[in-house]
Amino acid sequence: MGSRPTPGLQRTTSAEYRLPSTRPPASVPSTAPGGPVVGRGPTGGPQAPKAKWSALGADGVQRDQLWRELLEAERRSQQRWAQNWSFLKDYDPMGNKKEPVKLPDHVPRFSDTVPNSTNRAVGSRVDTPLGKTLIGLDFFFVEGARKKKLEEELQPI
């Protein structure tokens, strides 16, 4: 709880500004001249998985940069899909052109078949068979939350 730093986490200011990293950004290859060789231990062999994760956890800025690059690549690929493949939405799986769905000219604001309801108060169409069914379903749905009289053996003395 004190002000001791946690190992593996970078210190941040109150504005969530991360301190500058000493490592190269994610876009720079790790085998750049003068840069560390990632994935190799002191003897040149592969690092243990625990050491690999601790190395990743120590540099949040690099992970953040990598995440931003991945998001940008995803956005670009979505735009390319719209340019290259969006024509497929006009065809069915057999390759036939789909007919566009004709929307009605006028749609009434209130339904004739479904009762209007707001805040558990069913609207003006309660006398319809569907409205009566909904009231019955609502009655059984909230049954567990209702106060009930205790059975005789559970009554206080």
UniProtKB/Swiss-Prot annotation:
Residues 92-109 have a biased composition (Basic and acidic residues). It comes from the Eukaryota. Residues 1-57, 92-124 are annotated as: Disordered. Keywords: Cell projection. InterPro entries: C20orf85-like. GO terms for cellular component: cilium. Its main location: other. It is found in: Cell projection, Cilium. Signal peptide: none annotated. This is Ciliary microtubule inner protein 5. The gene is CIMIP5.
